[in-house]
Swiss-Prot record:
Bias (Basic and acidic residues): 267-283
Domain of life according to the entry: Eukaryota
The keyword Cytoplasm belongs to this UniProt entry's keyword annotation: no
This protein's name: L-ascorbate peroxidase S, chloroplastic/mitochondrial
Known catalytic reactions: L-ascorbate + H2O2 = L-dehydroascorbate + 2 H2O
Positions bearing the site annotation: Transition state stabilizer: 129
InterPro entries, per the entry: Ccp1-like, Haem_peroxidase, Haem_peroxidase_sf, Peroxidase_I, Peroxidases_heam-ligand_BS
Residues holding K(+): 263, 295, 302
CDD domains on file: ascorbate_peroxidase
The protein's Enzyme Commission number: 1.11.1.11
Protein encoded by which gene: APXS
Keywords for this protein: Calcium, Chloroplast, Heme, Hydrogen peroxide, Iron, Metal-binding, Mitochondrion, Oxidoreductase, Peroxidase, Plastid, Potassium, Transit peptide
Amino acid sequence: MAERVSLTLNGTLLSPPPTTTTTTMSSSLRSTTAASLLLRSSSSSSRSTLTLSASSSLSFVRSLVSSPRLSSSSSLSQKKYRIASVNRSFNSTTAATKSSSSDPDQLKNAREDIKELLSTKFCHPILVRLGWHDAGTYNKNIKEWPQRGGANGSLRFDIELKHAANAGLVNALNLIKDIKEKYSGISYADLFQLASATAIEEAGGPKIPMKYGRVDASGPEDCPEEGRLPDAGPPSPATHLREVFYRMGLDDKDIVALSGAHTLGRSRPERSGWGKPETKYTKEGPGAPGGQSWTPEWLKFDNSYFKEIKEKRDEDLLVLPTDAAIFEDSSFKVYAEKYAADQDAFFKDYAVAHAKLSNLGAEFNPPEGIVI
């Protein structure tokens, strides 16, 4: 049985440091720089949980790392603790309020830093997934913000990060931690979506018509309940996809176009329960080896996802039940066939769908957003 790793950080945000700190770990955290699976597995797997009871202050966390008392009593190595403290820094920073907005110049500069990160870490898939999973919790039937979910930066809080669908996304927070610290005038919600759109573009995909100015959810109490993101292998894949994406206000064309982003990345069985440990396409780099990809060139954004599913010629390529559904359902198939034959049409529809997804549930300040 594959082992899934998740983080649980117990403590009240922005409270004084407690007198003791207890750290336990039942499995080592494995950091990887290139991974993706938009859809979570419905199959069960064992989970390793790391728990911390500590202040949410970033400065306090840093002091803990160098504390002799912690060093002598902790069962974790310094390297493993640093991974946990990265997530802690995302939880502890004071969130933006409705009176704040991301700084346009900082957004532009952060975009350049993200491009540099992508060129050295090959982390396009996991950054795409980060933006999607923050936005994909939106429920159009709930009017109140931030209870309605969506692109509000709530994925930085441990209560949401430990959802099964978000397994491995602590690695995405690790990757962009320094950028967030460098550009404090950018909301988490904006940074997640900026990273996602930039990753698509830098992988050769279309330019996404993005806007910024998203306001951050203020605390873990604003996180949505678990279960709003799609499964990979539900009993009725087409019905399940519609239930999830219609709840967001998206339609069949959006569903198929967004599915095409699986042209990037790999599924890792230790996270999702799906895919092979490695294939001829993933046994070597770039990035950490392993997993099973949907396409041979899994860091290139193109329409090969649709071509490969249609042809079904390579057993080393992954096809999830929800992937197969886009060619089995009569309405989905219209778009899937179109995108397999016409990459320009796919790029056009994908750019619109991605921008739509990135805005779901967001509270913008100014209301019209910021274009950079």
